[in-house]
Amino acid sequence: MSAIILGIESSCDDTSAAVIKDGYLLSNVVSSQAVHEAYGGVVPELASRAHQQNIVPVVHEALKRAGVTKEELSAVAFTRGPGLMGSLLVGVSFAKGFARSLGIPLIDVNHLTGHVLAHFIKAEGEENIQPKFPFLCLLVSGGNSQIILVKAYNDMEILGQTIDDAAGEAIDKCSKVMGLGYPGGPIIDKLARQGNPKAYTFSKPHIPGLDYSFSGLKTSFLYSLRDWMKDDPDFIEHHKVDLAASLEATVVDILMDKLRKAAKEYKIKEVAVAGGVSANNGLRNSFREHAEKYGWNIFIPKFSYTTDNAAMIAITGYFKYLDKDFCSIDLPAYSRVTL
């Protein structure tokens, strides 16, 4: 009998629903919220209200595109955390009510696990090459920077993580200082393609082990701009492409330095990247260069799977469904939770 899983994602400012049948993606609908751009960041209350408006039509559209009726669903998987509590509660509450009304199992999914397992989403007509266990996954986003040893679908170990800011957060804040707008990641990425990555040098942390730190880079960037603008008030406008390229190169160097160490220490050649920052062109190019130089088998997600989406929640739910790993209807959402 087929396993058809509805996945629901509402951890931040994207409302998403997806349907997976026997591991194959049938639909993935994402509704993004433009309302936050005017505020230079996500406003939790506005995000929660938008989720309430979007959740029903998004789920309806996901089922419609999949050609599946709600009565055919085997289970409902939802993001339990981490994320914004007000946003999470919308998805969690809907999933509970929907599953209960249909009399089908409920499956809680860790948002971070979903990003890692996005590499196992299969789609008809696409090349479906997946990493072999064990593999390393660099999970980088606005809220997380982690090196994860993935031993199985349900067995992961964090080898290193940021002790302060995440990589994506540092990029967004530096972009904001430059007056480039929100979200900063895609803007920096676009500008960096036109600039010289060696034009400027910024501070790199010396953190023991496999942990990361990006607060020093952020401070170095801010102080450097302040000094340069004393001599030239229009310095940012005149040099923004080189600034973006140098910032991006520094972040990528920091990320890849620790990932190389992890790959060498654990003798692993299967290496993946996941999370919002995995859409960055400089990071993707660095992965390809490392694959050629060190013989890595690399796995870079489709752009549609880098940002928050329900397809990754549905595939994680599918694996948990096969293990009959269901949750109780009284399970709470968690704004802060690790793997």
UniProtKB/Swiss-Prot annotation:
Pfam family, one: TsaD
KW Endoplasmic reticulum (keyword) present: no
Binding site for substrate: 139-143, 172, 185, 189, 280
Signal peptide, first to last residue: none
Gene Ontology BP annotations: tRNA threonylcarbamoyladenosine modification
Molecular function per GO: iron ion binding; N(6)-L-threonylcarbamoyladenine synthase activity
Co-factor binding details: Binds 1 Fe(2+) ion per subunit.
Keyword Cytoplasm recorded: yes
Disulfide bonds: none
UniProt keyword annotations, A-Z: Acyltransferase, Cytoplasm, Iron, Metal-binding, Transferase, tRNA processing
GO cellular component terms listed in the entry, alphabetical order: cytoplasm
Catalytic activity from the UniProt record: L-threonylcarbamoyladenylate + adenosine(37) in tRNA = N(6)-L-threonylcarbamoyladenosine(37) in tRNA + AMP + H(+)
Entry-linked Gene3D superfamilies: 3.30.420.40
Record-listed Fe cation binding positions: 111, 115, 308
EC number of the protein: 2.3.1.234
Coiled coil ranges: none
Function as written in the Swiss-Prot or TrEMBL entry: Required for the formation of a threonylcarbamoyl group on adenosine at position 37 (t(6)A37) in tRNAs that read codons beginning with adenine. Is involved in the transfer of the threonylcarbamoyl moiety of threonylcarbamoyl-AMP (TC-AMP) to the N6 group of A37, together with TsaE and TsaB. TsaD likely plays a direct catalytic role in this reaction.
Membership in a protein family: Belongs to the KAE1 / TsaD family.
Protein name: tRNA N6-adenosine threonylcarbamoyltransferase
Lineage of the organism: Bacteria, Pseudomonadati, Bacteroidota, Bacteroidia, Bacteroidales
